[in-house]
Design a protein with these regions (language model features):
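A feature for loop-to-transmembrane-helix boundaries and adjacent hydrophobic helices
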Residues: 1-348
Length: 348
């Protein structure tokens, strides 16, 4: 029986503009990063930070995250790149797909921590601001799997089943054309996670990393059941895929962090970025550091001018005093001469 409704897969995942290839997978990642930075910047500014800070820190976090995501994928799926008949160079071809979210978060957090430390910013506060944006970025990035026709689920004939070309089907089911669109499931789930974090943050004023922990916990719940549907090769431990076990452990850690931190450090940070506070104070006073420097220079110049005028006036007074003294001395000498002449005349 042929399905009359299904989700088609793109005929190709790359479009060439002359010698330049435009890959759908990379395009989705780039769009996701821009959305995350844009939303994170708005949320950071709403918390009292500078609008440009999120983008500045992303310059560190994004490259670290991409490297971490690729490393996690290669390590957990090493059989795809190493061994007989495999070319290890393919491990570097990130544009062909293959990023592990846990590696991306771990190494991306390291890059963000380095940048935050350089600016005197708390990493948990920054993570809270960017958490919904990361979820939206994942929602967009998952469509890269659609372009590559990868990471789909089990065979199904549901109306929203995803049609996979024969070249991308599992070797043991080449005659099956439609599968669960797990990329779509995770994309929608991530949108829901982002909205949940935004709502909870407004409702409960989450701070000190708890908004980010909520994002992690909520994401792992969806990742667990979506991972269970996937049919791509993966390592299994006690009957579960490796990423399922990772989801369980990360979920437990995130929930524990929310509970413990809420007791030890309730509330939200009052100051998220010292530089923003300084800028706000300067703005409130109607000055800025550059203007202050200019004013100080002008005041110093005025003082120098006054000192110069004072010295000139003193010099004039001194000259006038000396001239007056000379005049008085001449007058005294003249008077003495007259008296002497008068006495001489009298004696004669």
């Amino acid at each position: 029986m042929e399905l009359i409704a299904f989700i088609p897969s793109p005929s190709r995942g790359v479009i060439h503009l002359g010698p330049i290839p435009l890959r759908g997978y990379a395009f989705c990642i780039i769009i996701g990063v821009f959305v995350a930075v844009w939303l994170g910047g708005r949320r950071w500014a709403a918390r009292g930070g500078l609008k440009t800070t999120v983008a500045d820190i992303a310059v560190w976090a994004v490259p670290f995250g991409l490297v971490g995501g690729r490393l996690y994928h290669v390590i957990t799926s090493y059989e795809l790149y190493f061994g007989e008949g495999k070319d290890w160079v393919n491990a570097f071809k990130i544009w062909e797909g293959g990023l592990g979210i846990w590696g991306a978060i771990a190494l991306g957090a390291l890059g963000a921590w380095i940048a935050c430390r350089r600016r005197g910013i708390s990493l948990p506060a920054y993570a809270d601001a960017v958490a919904p944006g990361i979820a939206f970025a994942q929602a967009i990035g998952r469509w890269g799997n659609w372009f590559n026709q990868e990471l789909y689920g089990r065979a199904t004939d549901l109306p929203w089943a995803l049609k996979i070309d024969s070249a991308h089907r599992p070797a043991d089911s080449l005659d099956v054309a439609t599968y669960h669109p797990t990329f779509l499931y995770e994309s929608l789930w991530c949108v829901g996670v982002a909205l949940l974090v935004i709502w909870a943050d407004r409702r409960f004023s989450l701070g000190r990393g708890r908004a980010f922990a909520l994002y992690v916990a909520a994401y792992t719940v969806g990742r667990f059941w979506i991972e269970y549907l996937r049919v791509d090769d993966a390592h299994h431990v006690l009957g579960l895929r490796l990423n399922d076990w990772t989801s369980i452990l990360v979920f437990a850690a995130a929930v524990a962090y929310i509970v413990v931190s809420a007791k030890l450090r309730p509330g939200r940070e009052e100051v998220v970025e010292p530089a923003a506070v300084a800028a706000a104070d300067a703005s409130a006073q109607g000055t800025d550091p550059d203007a202050k420097d200019t004013k100080d220079a002008k005041d110093a110049k005025d003082v120098d001018a006054k000192d110069a005028d004072g010295h000139a006036a003193d010099a004039k007074k001194t000259e006038a005093g000396e001239a007056e003294s000379d005049q008085n001395r001449d007058e005294e000498d003249g008077a003495a001469a007259v008296d002497a002449g008068a006495k001489t005349a009298k004696n004669l």
